């Protein structure tokens, strides 16, 4: 199992809209091959920052399967305009 860790810095004032968009986007990722689970947590000290933790069966399920899919294009359209700067994403085993 691989853990994807993404630090998401949302443009201040857009947090509620981001949470609403993420509630739609999470339905996309849940259907992807190799997906196990995910959590989105909001930072207590910096309420514009979130951490996204996604468990994948293997690294390529995320880096090739999800990111190479048409579903990822929908995910990007829902979420990427909220970020500044663009998220740091790393993987752990």
Question: Where in the sequence are the language-model features?
Answer:
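Conserved GNAT-fold acetyl-CoA-binding loop/helix
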Residues: 19, 23, 69-70
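An amphipathic, aromatic/His-enriched active-site/gating alpha helix that lines ligand/cofactor pockets
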Residues: 27-37, 55-89
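Short, well-ordered beta-strand segments in beta-rich or mixed alpha/beta enzyme
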Residues: 2-9, 39-67
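A general secondary-structure junction signal
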Residues: 42, 91-93
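Short, surface-exposed ligand-recognition loops at beta-strand->loop->(often short) alpha-helix junctions
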Residues: 9-19
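Absolute protein N-terminus
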Residues: 1-2, 93
């Amino acid at each position: 199992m691989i853990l994807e860790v993404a630090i998401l810095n949302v443009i201040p004032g857009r947090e509620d809209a981001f949470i609403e968009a993420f509630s739609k986007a999470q339905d996309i990722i849940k259907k992807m091959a190799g997906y196990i689970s995910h959590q989105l947590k909001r930072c207590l000290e910096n309420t514009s920052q979130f951490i996204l933790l996604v468990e994948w069966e293997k690294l390529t399920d995320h880096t090739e399967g999800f990111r190479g899919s048409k579903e990822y294009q929908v995910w990007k359209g829902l979420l990427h305009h909220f970020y500044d700067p663009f998220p740091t994403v790393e993987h752990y085993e």
